[in-house]
């Protein structure tokens, strides 16, 4: 039975939905994301004032955006923070950022460095979740995040200004039916959060993320954010323990806990977004075993060999390799890098920028591969030595193993694939054994 939340989302079976959350929970543990959320919380507290200072400078420089600033402050109070501490925290941050505008040039540089350090840490964490090996150039990363810091407040302020006009236009309707008003306002809050999360999941990782996956992860994160915000606000109001213990500064530890929960939700949504294509297309249950790299490498070479032997093109993109072998992008990249070092394959990169076509599936054409080695001379033993066992030294036992490998795997890849062509080529239809 297929599950389709909205027609343009991925269609998943109930079994795949269960697998998705099981795999996402495993990734959360493997990547130690609760601890990472703690590190991001500390970095956020340090960088929040510099980022707000930059935003305040933009609003001050352009008086036209003063309305946006008011809307942004209202969004911060009503949507981003639980009631009870929002006004207090906003007052402190506004006071700190106003004083920061009077800093010297050296102090301003220090603020900018702090903000950039936070952006780079977020970039590292997101690429770690997507298992990205190749990072963007440092200048490109700084420019991307600088654009987010400068344009983000304006876009949020503009959207909130539009939303306030919408609230005013529908005020009579929502006041007449309180339940409708509550649902309407909550839906708008979730929608704005979903757009923010979705944009984050698409822009930050140095990998093409299909927008359907980002929307699903963004929607789940936005719903979780709204639920946790309401529960946290109820806890702060009903259980005033922090106020009794900390007194006037009680808002600060509560704010730290809230920032931590916000980052935990953000990272969990990122894990779900990254896990969706893996559960849908790849063997998420696979645990590497001794010798499995040899089998996986042969599956990749089989696809490249078939493309080389075809009359069309010998070039194969990584998406086709994934579809034909069920190997993840990170798995296939590691294997292909070894083949690249051995001189068996070549990597071709597109000159154009990354692009995403809305309403269509993306094709990851940035990394394309072609088989260079002559399969008539490359043997199974060569592949085995690269991915499983290489004698290296002159030890007697190693030499015996080397001789056994040569005798048992002397066949050339071309002969092996020709014999296999009577059935399916390795990697064309791999057996799928899910747990």
Curated annotation (Swiss-Prot):
Q: Do you know which Pfam families this protein is assigned to?
A: Virul_fac_BrkB
Query: Quick check: keyword Zinc-finger in the entry?
Result: no
Q: According to its UniProt record, where is this protein mainly located?
A: membrane
Signal peptide span per the entry?
A: none
Superkingdom assignment? Bacteria
Subcellular location(s) per record: Cell inner membrane
- Recorded GO CC terms: plasma membrane
Q: Does the keyword rRNA-binding apply?
A: no
- TM region positions: 45-65, 103-123, 142-162, 177-197, 208-228, 252-272
Q: What keywords is this UniProt entry annotated with?
A: Cell inner membrane, Cell membrane, Membrane, Transmembrane, Transmembrane helix
State the annotated membrane topology for this chain: Multi-pass membrane protein
Q: Which HAMAP family match?
A: UPF0761
| Annotated family | Belongs to the UPF0761 family.
* Record PANTHER family: INNER MEMBRANE PROTEIN YHJD (PTHR30213), UPF0761 MEMBRANE PROTEIN YIHY (PTHR30213:SF0)
Q: Provide the protein name.
A: UPF0761 membrane protein mma_2179
- From which organism does this entry originate? Janthinobacterium sp. (strain Marseille) (Minibacterium massiliensis)
């Amino acid at each position: 039975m297929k599950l389709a939340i909205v027609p343009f989302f991925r269609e998943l079976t109930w079994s795949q939905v269960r697998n998705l959350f099981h795999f996402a929970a495993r990734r959360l543990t493997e990547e130690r994301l609760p601890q990472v959320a703690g590190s991001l919380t500390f970095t956020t507290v340090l960088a929040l004032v510099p980022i707000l200072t930059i935003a305040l400078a933009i609003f001050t420089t352009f008086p036209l955006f003063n309305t946006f600033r008011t809307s942004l402050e209202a969004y911060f109070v009503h949507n981003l923070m639980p009631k009870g501490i929002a006004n207090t925290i906003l007052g402190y941050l506004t006071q700190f950022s106003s004083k920061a505008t009077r800093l010297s040039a050296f102090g301003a540089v220090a603020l900018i460095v702090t903000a950039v350090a936070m952006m780079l840490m977020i970039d590292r964490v997101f690429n770690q979740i997507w298992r990205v090996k190749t990072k963007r150039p440092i200048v490109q990363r700084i420019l991307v995040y600088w654009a987010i810091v400068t344009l983000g407040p304006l876009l949020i302020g503009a959207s909130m200004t539009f939303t306030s006009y919408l609230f005013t236009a529908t005020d009579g309707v929502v006041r007449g039916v309180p339940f409708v008003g509550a649902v309407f306002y909550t839906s708008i809050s979730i929608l704005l959060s979903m757009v923010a999360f979705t944009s984050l999941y698409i822009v930050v990782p140095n990998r093409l993320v299909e927008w359907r996956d980002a929307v699903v992860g963004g929607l789940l994160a936005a719903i979780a954010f709204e639920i946790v915000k309401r529960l946290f606000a109820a806890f702060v109001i009903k259980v005033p323990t922090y106020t009794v213990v900390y007194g006037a500064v009680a808002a600060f530890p509560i704010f730290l806990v809230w920032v931590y929960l916000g980052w935990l939700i953000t990272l969990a949504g990122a894990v779900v977004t990254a896990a969706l294509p893996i559960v849908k297309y790849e063997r998420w249950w696979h645990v590497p075993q001794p010798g499995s790299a040899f089998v996986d490498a042969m599956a990749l070479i089989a696809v490249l060999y078939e493309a080389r032997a075809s009359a069309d093109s010998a070039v194969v993109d990584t998406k086709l390799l994934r579809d034909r072998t069920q190997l993840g992008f990170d798995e296939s990249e590691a294997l292909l890098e070894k083949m690249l070092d051995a001189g068996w394959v070549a990597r071709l990169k597109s000159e154009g920028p990354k692009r995403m076509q809305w309403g269509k599936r993306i094709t990851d054409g940035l990394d394309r591969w072609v088989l260079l080695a002559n399969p008539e001379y490359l043997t199974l033993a060569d592949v085995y030595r690269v991915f499983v066992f290489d004698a290296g030294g002159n030890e007697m036992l190693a030499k015996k193993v080397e001789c056994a490998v040569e005798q048992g795997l002397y066949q050339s890849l071309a002969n092996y694939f020709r014999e296999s062509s009577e059935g399916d080529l390795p990697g064309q239809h791999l057996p799928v054994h899910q747990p």
